[in-house]
Amino acid sequence: MEPLLVRAARRQPVERTPVWFMRQAGRTLPGYRAIRKRLGLFDVCRRPELCAQVTLEPVELHGVDAAVMFADIMLPVIGMGVDVQLVENVGPVIEHPVESVEDVRKLQVPEPEESVPFILEAVGLVRRALQPDKALVGFCGGPFTVAGYLIEGRPTRDFVRTKRCMFRSPEVWHELMERLSETFLRYVRAKVEAGADAIQLFDSWVGALTLADYEEFAAPYSERILGGLSVPTIHFGTGTSHLLESMAAAGGDVIGLDWRTPLAEGWERVGHDRGVQGNLDPALLLGPWERVEASTDAILQAAGGRPGHIFNLGHGVLPDTDPASLRRLRELVHERTAAVAGAK
C-alpha cells in the first residue's frame, strides 16, 4: 500500500488524515540545534548521512506521516553558479545580484546528479529508513520567490527591484525564469528518481504580486514544474488568497492554504477535484493548548471528512515552538480523524 499522504493527495479514502509540518526538520529540535552549533545549513546538506538524520528526527519524535527532505530552496542555484550565503537572522544573501541579461546568461542549468549528488544520496537513505506508510516529501522553491532573492540580493517584503525587472526588462525576467524553472524541474525529478514520494513547490513570496502579474510573470513557470512530475504535487504560497484559483490552474494535486484563508472557503475556490493542505496558524502553538485544540477541531470540521485533506500548519513551525506540542497536535488530528473514518 502507498504512503498515507500519497493516498490523501490523490483523494483516495484514508484511515485518518495525514499530518506533517512545514519546517518540521530543523530549528525546534534538539538534535538539529546541536548539529548547527558546528555546521552551517549547506554543510549539513552536503553530508548525506547527517542530512538524512535531520530529516528523520521529526518523524521519530512527532510520529508525523511524512518526512520532508531537509534542504534550502536556494540549494539548487549554487549549481547554477550563484554565490549565496545563508546569513543568520537575515536569510539568503547574494554577493552579485542579477541585474542584466548578461548576468542571466552566466547562469548554468546544471544536472542534479553533478550539482547536488549529496542530496540525492540523502533522499535514498531516508526513503530506505522510512516505514512504507510514511511518505518522503521533496521540495523546491517557487521560481518567483527564488528569482526575487537573486535580483534583490537579500530578503525583502516589497520586491521593488524584482518588479522593476519584470516591468522594465521583461526579456531579462523571462530568461531568468526559464533557467530557474528548468533547473528546479530537473532537481525535483531527480529527487523523485532517488525516492521522493511527493513534491511541494514553496512559492513563499508570490503573494507580493497582483493576480494579473502573477498570471503573466510567475504562473507559467510554476506550471512547468508542477506539470512535469509523475508523483503527487503540493502547491503552496503565503498571502495568496487573491491568487488561489490561478494557483490551482497552474497546477498541484494539492493546494496549500496559509492560515489567513478559511479552509472550507479555500477548498471551494480551488475546487473539490483536488486536495488541500493546512492550515493552522503556527503562532497558535505558542499559546494555550485549549485554543490549539479548538482551532484544530474547526479546521477538521471544515474539511468535513472529504478525501484530499492533509493537515499542516499555515506556514512553517516557528523557532520558539515546543516540540512536544507538535507531537500532541499530531496525536489530536489522528485521534479525531481516525474516529470519523471508523464511523463511516
Language-model features: where?
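N-terminal start-of-chain detector that recognizes signal peptides
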Residues: L39-G40, Q108-P110, L229, A248-A250
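N-terminal small/glycine-rich loop or linker at the start of catalytic domains
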Residues: Q12-V44, I73, I78-E88, H96-S100, ...
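A gly/proline- and charged-residue-enriched helix-loop-helix capping module
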Residues: N89-R128
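Active-site loop segments of alpha/beta catalytic cores
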Residues: S115-K344
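N-terminal basic, low-complexity leaders that serve as flexible interaction/assembly modules and, when applicable
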Residues: M1-E88, L125, E223-R224, P323-K344
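The substrate-binding groove and active-site-proximal loops of carbohydrate-active enzymes
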Residues: F42-R46, L107-V116, P282-L286
